[in-house]
Amino acid sequence: METQIRADEISRVLKEQINQYNKKIEVSETGSVLSVGDGVARIYGLENAMAGELVEFPGEVFGMVLNLEEGYVGAVLFGEDRHIKEGDVVKRTKKIVSVPVGEALLGRVVDALGNPIDGRGAINTPHSRIVETKAPGIVYRHPVEEPLQTGIKAIDALVPIGRGQRELIIGDRQTGKTTIAVDTIINQKGLNVQCFYVAIGQKQSTVALVVEKLRAAGALEYTTVIAANASDPAPLQYLAAYSGTAMAEYFRDTGRHALIVYDDLTKQAQAYRQLSLLLRRPPGREAYPGDVFYCHSRLLERASKLSADKGGGSLTALPIIETQAGDISAYIPTNVISITDGQIFLESDLFYKGVRPAISVGKSVSRVGGAAQIKAMKQVAGSLKLELAQFRSMEAFAAFASDLDKASQQQLARGRRLIEVLKQPQYSPVKVEEQIIMIFAAGNAFVDQYPETDVKRYEKEMIEFLKNKHSDIIKTISEKKAIADDTKKALLAALEEFKAIFQPSNK
């Protein structure tokens, strides 16, 4: 018995199959790998590729186009190159390298491409930004006038930092550069400043320690850590600083304040040198490529204080540079010194003497200066730098002199007590009003009569005494940000009152 198929059934089956057919034709511009090795690939056939474009290799490995040659393009890889071989197909994405930005990144640890690496799930944010953007022009900027308090007495008094400034932290390894940066981040708690810590070429254990310190201080909730570790490919170490800046710019451009720390740009320059030599770019001084200055200047120029028309936001940058045996005249240190608005120079000799933070008063400078200080700090810290500089020169002279007159001995004794006042343990920033009161007490000779070993105890007990008995003085300085005549009289009277009850250890 023959099965008869009706014509309407045939048409129905055909329609169903047509509706179910969903195969898509994907059109993409492709090229092929000519050679690959050391994290760099040469690709033939991507005639329309853009500089900085993201390209896709087999196995979901991505790269970035850096060289545009006549017959090929040079790309750096953001992943392992072990499984990529000659002849592999490379696709254009037609996208410039970008990273996610927004509030969702606060409190997270991400890699140089914005992917989370803290094991706390995906980052959900609708916003993204290109990693390399043009710095704001002159007409869109506002002079740096608003202080960014670091909580470190020696910095806030002697080399003040303003919102929108670029202040270099420079010194040999193990002199406390990272500690200053982390202290500054911790001190932004409650000040509505979003912080970004970019770790470039650091050991994973070091980055984990910084993250733990931030978490313990309650600072991680307003901080994003961007980590390109020593084990990561050189392209990620090069890119991390630009990615972090793009994330921070989101807050600056929405009228808020951000702080970014680059720890450190020496390793970024070394990663860029490695990439440039592998891409066969001509080497220059110390084998760095000719555009290594531009690599850093275009990064640091993005830190700025915007005008009120642009929302009045700010991005403050604290780049870190590591020197070799205190040589600040090397290529990368001189480059970054010339780009930034001042530097905080840390000396190994001071560090080993127990002066911490080991800030060299003579070599450290802020080109913004008093504009980034509140009036009260200007009033008390005006003569401090001069006194410390005179002490350092007198100390050097005293090392060779056998007999000193009484005035010189007094100057040396006073200088040593001022140094004690400026000493500070790590991860313990001090409120600006407390800094002002302590520097005021030292400037008015209230600590001169006590042994050096008593200065820290004097500071602690004196601040506690004022908080308990004269909290109105601290409140007035905090609110008015200046020391009026009546406040000065009240503070002097309170210090005299404390002087009567303080017990030095030698009595």
UniProtKB/Swiss-Prot annotation:
SUPFAM superfamilies from the UniProt entry: C-terminal domain of alpha and beta subunits of F1 ATP synthase, N-terminal domain of alpha and beta subunits of F1 ATP synthase, P-loop containing nucleoside triphosphate hydrolases
InterPro entries reported for this sequence: ATP_synth_asu-like_sf (IPR023366), ATP_synth_asu_C (IPR000793), ATP_synth_asu_C_sf (IPR038376), ATP_synth_F1_a_nt-bd_dom (IPR033732), ATP_synth_F1_asu (IPR005294), ATPase_F1/V1/A1_a/bsu_N (IPR004100), ATPase_F1/V1/A1_a/bsu_N_sf (IPR036121), ATPase_F1/V1/A1_a/bsu_nucl-bd (IPR000194)
EC id: 7.1.2.2
Pfam families, per database record: ATP-synt_ab, ATP-synt_ab_C, ATP-synt_ab_N
HAMAP family in UniProt: ATP_synth_alpha_bact
Family: Belongs to the ATPase alpha/beta chains family.
Subunit-structure text: F-type ATPases have 2 components, CF(1) - the catalytic core - and CF(0) - the membrane proton channel. CF(1) has five subunits: alpha(3), beta(3), gamma(1), delta(1), epsilon(1). CF(0) has three main subunits: a(1), b(2) and c(9-12). The alpha and beta chains form an alternating ring which encloses part of the gamma chain. CF(1) is attached to CF(0) by a central stalk formed by the gamma and epsilon chains, while a peripheral stalk is formed by the delta and b chains.
Protein's name according to its UniProt entry: ATP synthase subunit alpha
Gene that encodes the chain: atpA
